[in-house]
Amino acid sequence: MMAVVLLAGCGASNIWQDVQNGDMASVQSQVKSGADLDARDALGRTPLYYAVYYEHLNIVALLVENGANVNMKHKANKTPLHLASELGNIQMVRLLLKAGAKVNALDSDQGTPLDWAVGTLHNDTAALLRKNGGKEGSALIP
């Protein structure tokens, strides 16, 4: 279902399909051809968000190295770091933090990446986020 929404929302570029399939060579070709790395699908998700969703660490690294916005939010205000934290993908969380992802970004429910890591019982990810200044959303809202 996600792929259908993705492809329907984007039209011309096939970077979405290449990212979903984990086709590194094709994604590299798209990047070299000047693909818009911050283009959004109908739900506001970028190629980087999909690379995180499908857990393609090498593609996440490629997109980040080529200027993809690590803090771009989709319609529910969730960033790639929220998603990586929810998935408990500690390598991806490290990469995104190193690339400047906002550790305390709030989503539409006032949740932070730490809230997502804690809520999905990813304790190692939660510890990493805390070490990098991560707080729960309730601590950030007056």
Features from the language model and the residues they span:
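Bacterial N-terminal signal peptides
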Residues: M1-L7
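Ankyrin repeat structural motif
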Residues: D23-V31, H56-V64, N89-L97, H122-K131
